[in-house]
Amino acid sequence: MKHILPILTITTLAAAASAQSAAASSGLSYNRVGLGYNSESKGYSLTASALIGGSNVLVGASSTIGGNNTGNGADSVSLGYVFKNVAFGADATVSVASNEAYGLNVRKDLGNSIELAASFNRDSGDNNVWGAELAYNVSKQIQLAVGYSDSNAAGAAGDGQTIISARYNF
């Protein structure tokens, strides 16, 4: 029973990859690297993601650097599938990451270089993490964002976290 969620996730990704035709472009970039600052832990995070070839399969990686809660090297790699223009022009991404973490992320290009995102993730410690982010595209390559996340984790890990990020789209 423990492995039912990973099996369902992989099956969903495989079915989506074979069934979804090329959707219209949403204007969102998934090929990017970023540096974020977490106001709660006073630490940084490095992130990178990219679509594989011309597909909707998304690979990602992240790592923490310093901070008073996480320390160095809270690393993660992920594999996901982007469903473009699912509803109201928003993209939805389902993903599975290292250490039995699962996620759903919804992103919407609001126009005028503004983007909104909402996410739900569940990690191996049975912690639910909710998040929201507002981003501004300074140029086609540079994006600035502010996000907030909260979880049901015990202690400092469950406190609300504000993250300020700068990203480079490639």
Would you name each region that the model predicts?
Residues 2-170:
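Outer-membrane beta-barrel proteins
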